[in-house]
């Protein structure tokens, strides 16, 4: 029972870390990467689909992405979706190829991005702590129902705290890596 609660908590903590990594991947550093456009959705025959399902997205160079739609009718729709996204990008269409040039980051914008990733990291830490709190309340409930002893409950709380500390450290490591990549010129 205790192992099940700990395992369940660890799985939830892994999901929080993966969610944080996903959020970090959408915040661009100095290099172009196709994942930058993952959050853009296109109206494709009445349904909203990710850009990657209607076009091939590739990196042309360190500052340029290239989107090649599979249907030529979609060129203007994709271009409009990229322009209206909150990414601040201006696509250029040449024939059926859309090129997206990424402007260099200013020091001010880098500072804003660092603030954003710190907020995301803090949200992840809060999620991890909430998972720990839920596990501890489950342990207390088991203790109250006399399914486990005080010693077992104390050990379980100690173990879940060690797991929590480990995941908080992972968040810090990911935050530091992302912060370094954003501040790199």
Swiss-Prot record:
Signal sequence region: none
Q: Show the GO cellular component annotation of the record.
A: cytosol
Where would you say this protein principally sits, based on its record?
cytoplasm
- Tell me which Gene Ontology terms the entry assigns under biological process: cytoplasmic translational termination
User: Which keywords does UniProt give here?
Assistant: Cytoplasm, Protein biosynthesis
Q: Where in the cell is it found?
A: Cytoplasm
Q: Which domain of life does the UniProt lineage start with?
A: Bacteria
A GO term for molecular function? ribosomal large subunit binding
Q: Which InterPro entries match?
A: Ribosome_recyc_fac (IPR002661), Ribosome_recyc_fac_dom (IPR023584), RRF_sf (IPR036191)
The record's similarity note reads: Belongs to the RRF family.
What this chain does, per the record? Responsible for the release of ribosomes from messenger RNA at the termination of protein biosynthesis. May increase the efficiency of translation by recycling ribosomes from one round of translation to another.
Q: What is this protein called?
A: Ribosome-recycling factor
Recite the lineage of the species: Bacteria, Pseudomonadati, Pseudomonadota, Gammaproteobacteria, Candidatus Pseudothioglobaceae
């Amino acid at each position: 029972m205790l192992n099940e609660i700990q395992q369940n908590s660890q799985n939830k903590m892994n999901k929080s870390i993966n969610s944080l990594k996903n959020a970090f991947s959408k915040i661009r550093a100095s290099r172009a990467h196709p994942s930058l456009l993952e959050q853009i959705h296109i109206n494709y025959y009445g349904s909203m689909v990710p850009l990657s399902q209607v076009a091939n997205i590739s990196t042309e160079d360190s500052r340029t992405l290239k989107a090649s739609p599979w249907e030529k009718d979609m060129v203007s729709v994709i271009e409009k979706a990229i322009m209206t996204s909150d990414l601040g990008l201006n696509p250029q269409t040449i024939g059926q190829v859309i090129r997206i040039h990424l402007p260099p980051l200013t020091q001010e914008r880098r500072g804003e991005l660092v603030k954003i990733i710190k907020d995301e990291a803090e949200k992840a830490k809060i999620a991890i702590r909430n998972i720990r709190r839920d596990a501890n309340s489950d342990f207390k409930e088991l203790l109250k129902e006399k399914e486990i002893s005080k010693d077992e409950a104390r050990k379980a709380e100690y173990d879940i705290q060690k797991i929590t500390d480990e995941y908080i450290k992972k968040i810090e490591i990911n935050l530091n890596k992302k912060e370094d990549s954003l501040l790199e010129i």
